[in-house]
Structure formats: C-alpha cells, structure tokens
C-alpha cells in the first residue's frame, strides 16, 4: 500500500475516547542547540481509526493523509503491539 512520499510515524495511543479518532504520542530525541544534551520531545497527532480498533497504550503506526477534519491529518495503518 505504498503511496509516494507519505510520512509514517510509530507512537503510543494516549487517548481513544473520541469516535473513530485516536491521539498518538510520538517521541523523538532532539539535541539541545546550545547545550548539546539529548532531550525527549513528544508530539501528539490526532489520527483516524475507522474501526475503533486501537486501544489505550497500544503501539501503532500512523501515516500522513489528506485533511480529514480541523486537526486530523493522519490515519492508522496498523497496530504494532497491543497494550499489556
């Protein structure tokens, strides 16, 4: 299902309370520009989950897509790991 240069991210589901929408927190390591320390930066994305299959704390893969609402520009591709 390759669609050109669409970005993909892997993150954890931090909210599944909305219908057909999940909030995914993606953590990246960034070096501080002045001090050089590696800092964890968390970005939250709202993603479309058509079947409401992702649950809280699942590891999921999301892919960039067309704008689906005011905040949603990502969609669920697969659940990498179910929450324990």
Curated annotation (Swiss-Prot):
Coiled-coil annotated spans: none
Query: What are the leading ranks of the lineage?
Result: Bacteria, Bacillati, Bacillota, Clostridia, Eubacteriales
UniProt record, GO biological process: translation
GO MF terms listed in the record are:
rRNA binding; structural constituent of ribosome
Q: Quaternary state and partners of this protein?
A: Part of the 30S ribosomal subunit.
* Stated role: One of the primary rRNA binding proteins, it binds specifically to the 5'-end of 16S ribosomal RNA.
Keywords, alphabetical:
Ribonucleoprotein, Ribosomal protein, RNA-binding, rRNA-binding
Protein source organism? Clostridium acetobutylicum (strain ATCC 824 / DSM 792 / JCM 1419 / IAM 19013 / LMG 5710 / NBRC 13948 / NRRL B-527 / VKM B-1787 / 2291 / W)
Return the HAMAP family for the record.
Ribosomal_uS17_B
Alphabetized Gene3D superfamilies for the sequence:
Nucleic acid-binding proteins
Q: Which family does it belong to?
A: Belongs to the universal ribosomal protein uS17 family.
A GO cellular component annotation in the UniProt record: cytosolic small ribosomal subunit
Q: InterPro entries under this entry?
A: NA-bd_OB-fold, Ribosomal_uS17, Ribosomal_uS17_bact/chlr
By what name is this protein known?
A: Small ribosomal subunit protein uS17
Which CDD domains does the record cross-reference, listed alphabetically? Answer: Ribosomal_uS17 (cd00364)
């Amino acid at each position: 299902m390759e669609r050109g240069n669409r970005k993909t991210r892997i993150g954890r589901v931090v909210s599944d309370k909305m219908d057909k929408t999940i909030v995914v927190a993606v953590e990246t390591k960034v070096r501080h520009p002045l001090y050089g320390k590696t800092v964890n930066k968390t970005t939250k994305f709202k993603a479309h989950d058509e079947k409401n299959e992702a649950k809280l704390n699942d590891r999921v893969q999301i892919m960039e897509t067309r704008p689906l609402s005011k905040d949603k520009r990502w969609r669920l591709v697969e659940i990498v790991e179910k929450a324990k």
